[in-house]
């Protein structure tokens, strides 16, 4: 009898996500924070009929049916013992309703987690970027880089800007619980606990007061403002306009919202500072003059008439002066 009990029990490793590092401006003002949320998670190996279970939960909790094919697709590309998220940002009513019916859904649990939030919304979008749900492409890249296990309990990953560039520093180290469970999946005892290690906090060169002022100056315009400290090259403000609220990508952008951004003639998704290609215009003249003086090709008293057009020898393209008669 004891041998049978022992065989029916098994060891299970439950990963836990690390808190993502926070992002501050140069004066310690919080720019990217973590807020508590509740999600509904499913462990495929503990579910007899995954599709049926997902459909029943969607009906019971009045969830978005578009989540069904997405979760089934994720299940085909990840390990069966890793939890998959069916729904996030559950409200109190949904949490209570699931708790009453949880006995019907083995392998399904409500989990508390921290969700990224950007309190300054579209003021910092193109500088900070954003995090969003880990997709199949992300999973493949993580596996290729040997980082997949560290993301076993993580929902989001940096997609743009600072959030993407400093992903390794911000993410942290996953923790885990090693538990003994019975043949029904019930946890009998915890054998080992390794707490997660929070990601590193980042302090940017940006001054949020200057950032907000630059943002205000760009209202109703298209373009960008980049302010630098000439003493050390640090970025004080980084604004591309128009912008958008990155929080819609964190919670899961709808097809309607994304289509509106794509169709917007002002192209808010474009980072006009780092992605825009613009002719340097007259800003290149001091550079060329200094180069000429340095090489002895001209003197401080040299005068040059630019004319209405300029053509690089051996090329067909003509660059036109904004003034018809030239300078």
What role is predicted for each listed range?
Residues 223-239, 282-287, 291, 303-310, ...:
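Active-site-adjacent helix/loop patches that line small-molecule binding or acyl-intermediate pockets
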Residues 236-251:
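Short, solvent-exposed beta-strand-terminating loops
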Residues 267-273, 298-327:
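Conserved catalytic neighborhood of penicillin-recognizing serine enzymes
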Residues 1-187, 194-195, 220-224, 230, ...:
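Membrane-proximal periplasmic segments of bacterial cell-envelope enzymes
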Residues 188-234:
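A conserved hydrophobic secondary-structure block that centers on an alpha-helix together
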Residues 251-275:
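Surface-exposed acidic, glycine/proline-enriched linker/cap segments
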Residues 20, 50, 158, 206, ...:
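Hydrophobic (often cysteine-bearing) scaffold residues that line and stabilize catalytic clefts
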Residues 28, 56, 98, 127, ...:
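Active-site SXXK
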